[in-house]
């Protein structure tokens, strides 16, 4: 979801397209398992193929670089990208763009805060720029909420105005009024742990 969010938000049901994608994902997993068993592909290779489908990771070099530059956990950055776009360059119905689903309005704010001068909307399709802007905004939110990850992630999804109404610096997951935002925060925190466990080397967490 976009970092810029209006106050009136309600939980969204999965669309038909999302439901089809989920069914297709499980179909592919079942097919991989079947083929692996049939042709004797190693268990490790099958597990890696399933991981690449269920927990994708792309642009890990950019994620590592931007996380180090912004003093962020690269696993959290990967988890935000997963929850926002499943690592697909796309545009949401709200006009949010790219891997970290940033609206042009929010991008212009980030440009101003970071001292940029030449941003154009099409830049948000560039993974380097999109992840750079998303990481800058995530770092800004973490600093704004004194390191409270729940508050920062909720603000990334629903906006700082809503988070301030729900508890601000002291926000807990149970305080989040929007079911969609609560589910978003839950997912990011869970995927953060999954990325740490599954991609420690790729994300530079073992060095």
Where are the language model's segments positioned?
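N-terminal Lys/Arg-rich, disordered targeting/topogenic segments
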Residues: 1-22
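Hydrophobic membrane-insertion alpha-helices, especially the h-region
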Residues: 25-43
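Catalytic glycan-binding domains that act on GlcNAc-containing polysaccharides
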Residues: 42-207
């Amino acid at each position: 979801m976009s970092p810029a969010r209006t106050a009136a938000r309600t939980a969204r049901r999965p669309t038909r397209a999302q439901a089809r994608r989920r069914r297709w994902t499980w179909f592919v997993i079942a097919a991989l398992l079947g083929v692996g068993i049939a042709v004797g592909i190693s268990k490790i290779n099958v597990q890696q193929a399933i991981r690449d489908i269920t927990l994708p990771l792309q642009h890990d070099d950019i994620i590592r670089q931007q996380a180090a530059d912004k003093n962020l956990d690269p696993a959290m950055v990967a988890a935000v990208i997963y929850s926002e776009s499943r690592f697909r360059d796309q545009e949401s119905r709200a006009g949010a763009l790219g891997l970290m689903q940033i609206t042009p309005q929010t991008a212009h704010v980030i440009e101003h805060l970071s001292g940029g001068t030449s941003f154009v909307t099409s830049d948000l399709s560039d993974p380097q720029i999109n992840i750079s802007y998303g990481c800058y905004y995530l770092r800004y939110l973490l600093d704004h909420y004194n390191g409270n990850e729940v508050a920062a992630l909720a603000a990334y999804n629903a906006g700082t105005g809503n988070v301030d109404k729900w508890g601000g610096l002291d926000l807990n997951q149970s305080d989040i009024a929007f079911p969609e935002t609560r589910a978003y925060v839950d997912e990011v925190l869970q995927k953060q742990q999954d990325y740490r466990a599954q991609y420690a080397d790729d994300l530079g967490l073992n060095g």
